[in-house]
Design a protein with these regions (language model features):
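Short catalytic micro-motifs in class I SAM-dependent methyltransferases
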Residues: 179-180
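Conserved acidic residues
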Residues: 173
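A conserved beta-strand element that flanks and buttresses the S-adenosyl-L-methionine
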Residues: 176
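Class I (Rossmann-like) S-adenosyl-L-methionine-dependent methyltransferase catalytic domain
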Residues: 2-96, 100, 107, 111-167, ...
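Active-site charged/polar residues at nucleotide-handling catalytic sites that mediate phosphoryl
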Residues: 170
């Protein structure tokens, strides 16, 4: 059965529609940044999504209202149906070698779609979820079983430079970043990797999922696909000591965008 979501997704794939949405997003972002001097495109993105969620509109990965599947109908998430979200994604990170006794950082935890499984998996106090927006985290808190939060005592924090320093002192063993870097514009990649570098001490591993393309491409108004070479260059410009590898993931496509995806693995000896 055709749904409005299905029609919207088909329209979004048209080159003219994509170009218009990018033009409109850039125009809106420029106006917002004039009203908010010193703010970045990512800050505009956060504000835009926050207002979207505040109006009760569905979002594919954030908040308490979503879609039954990529082109499905809207759904109100509750603790029961939310509990199965992100399970397959967490299996990918689980396969990367993370163990319950490790200190785990979820870099861009959003509304805990994947983070809830990391919380359940990790030993008490060994999960720290970070996101640029406190409002995204709070919506996740309301969807996760309160008993799980009480039992596992996860740390959940909005990102600031001071917070990144505190995470570095905590000395995480494993950092994952799921469907985050696709929303980071190219000129903000250095900040993304600089924060990651600061959090990573010796022996730490970071696993970053990204939408893959032969070259950098803006695939939606607020989403980018990156080439392996571009991400390597951006990371090594921040920290040349990183050991970097790129691997395929289990199903090979983004669950949200249906685009080719891979994972970037960064390690420190």
């Amino acid at each position: 059965m055709l749904t409005m979501r299905y029609v919207e997704k088909k329209v979004e794939q048209l080159p003219v529609a994509r170009s218009l949405s990018i033009w409109w997003a850039d125009r809106q972002s420029a106006a917002w940044r004039r009203r908010n001097p010193g703010k970045s495109f990512s800050d505009y993105y956060v504000d835009h999504v926050r207002r979207h969620l505040d109006r009760g509109k569905p979002h594919p990965t954030l908040g308490q209202v979503g879609f039954t599947h990529e082109t499905g109908t809207g759904i109100d998430w509750d603790r029961a149906n939310f509990a199965i979200r992100g399970r397959n994604a967490w299996r990918e990170y689980r396969a990367a070698g993370v163990e319950p006794q490790m200190r785990i950082v979820d870099y861009g935890c959003g509304s805990l779609r994947v983070g809830q499984h990391a919380i359940r998996f990790a030993d008490r106090g060994n999960y720290w979820g970070l996101d640029v927006a406190e409002t995204f985290i709070e919506q996740g808190r309301r969807l996760v079983d309160p008993q799980l939060l009480e039992d596992k005592r996860p740390r959940l924090s909005a990102i600031t430079e001071r917070l990144i320093d505190l995470v570095a002192v905590w000395e995480p063993h494993f950092i994952f970043s799921h469907t985050v870097i696709q929303h980071v514009p190219e000129d903000e990649l250095p900040l993304y990797f600089a924060r990651l570098a600061k959090m990573m001490g010796p022996g730490c591993k970071a696993v970053i999922e990204f939408i893959s393309a032969p070259r950098t491409k803006r695939i939606k108004a607020m989403s980018w696909a990156y080439s392996e070479a571009r991400l390597r260059a951006a990371a090594l410009s921040v920290d040349p000591s990183w050991s970097i590898s790129i691997e395929d993931v289990a199903d090979g496509t983004s669950q949200v965008m249906k685009k080719p995806r891979r994972v970037m693995i960064l390690e420190r000896d």
